[in-house]
A protein has these predicted regions:
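Short N-terminal signal/transit or membrane-insertion segments
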Residues: 1-2, 76, 208-209
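C-terminal domain-tail junction helix/linker
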Residues: 14, 20, 25, 34, ...
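RNase H-like DDE/DDD metal-dependent nuclease/strand-transfer catalytic core used by mobile genetic elements
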Residues: 37, 42-61, 69-177, 181-182
Length: 210
């Protein structure tokens, strides 16, 4: 009887409310290099032209963003490998004018073998250990923990990849260099309408005074 009443609508079902997932808000870091987020974005296939398109190439953009100043460094590679993560890291250390204390990444094989082997360290992890840089991994399937670099990739898509094309990796990196200069000098509301370069300059000047 109860089932029949429910079926014809005499008894209303109680709707269960889905619990909304609340993403924890992290405190803003105050020291450049205290934590740097790194991630990889695959270059959209429709951006490829000429030989790159004919050969079925895939390009990948490595991105690092300092959580304090939002200063970024980007570079493109043809292969999605731990070895290219190391190359990118070495370039990053030359580009950022401050000491990096911690690097935060997802669990991709270009960064860690944690979920393939609990004992074997990836080449990237070994390199970080040699350099004395902490490596922080975000939980699996939680890209919002790397939210700053994820948002920067969405901005890259909107302001760069939606408009540009590339025939080879050299052309990608030439154009990325100009885009990086623009993004590092663009004012941001989250930085009180300062650019990453302006905030970095202020932080370094303040450090020199003390």
């Amino acid at each position: 009887m109860i089932y029949e009443a429910k079926r014809i609508g005499l008894v209303k079902y109680k709707k269960t409310k889905k619990k909304s997932r609340k993403h924890r808000r992290y405190p803003e870091l105050l020291i450049p290099g205290e934590k740097v987020q790194i991630d990889v974005k695959e270059v959209p296939y429709n951006c490829l032209r000429g030989k790159a398109l004919r050969d079925g190439k895939h390009f990948y953009q490595w991105t690092a963003i300092d959580e304090c100043t939002r200063m970024r460094f980007v570079y493109g590679f043809e292969e999605h490998t731990p070895e290219n993560s190391i190359k990118f890291l070495k370039m990053l250390l030359k580009e950022f004018p401050f000491k990096i204390q911690t690097i935060q990444t997802d669990n991709g094989r270009e960064f860690t073998y944690k979920y393939q082997s609990s004992e074997v360290k990836s080449p990237f992890e070994i390199e970080l250990n040699k350099l004395g840089i902490n490596h922080k991994l975000i939980p699996p399937r939680t890209p919002w923990h790397n939210g700053k670099v994820e948002r920067s990739h969405r901005n890259d898509q909107r302001h760069f990849y939606d408009w540009e094309t590339f025939r080879n990796i050299e052309e990608l990196n030439t154009k990325l260099k100009g885009h990086l200069e623009w993004s590092n000098n663009k004012t941001m509301r989250t930085l009180d309408y300062k650019s990453p370069m302006q905030l970095l300059s202020e932080k370094l000047e303040l450090k020199s005074i003390h």
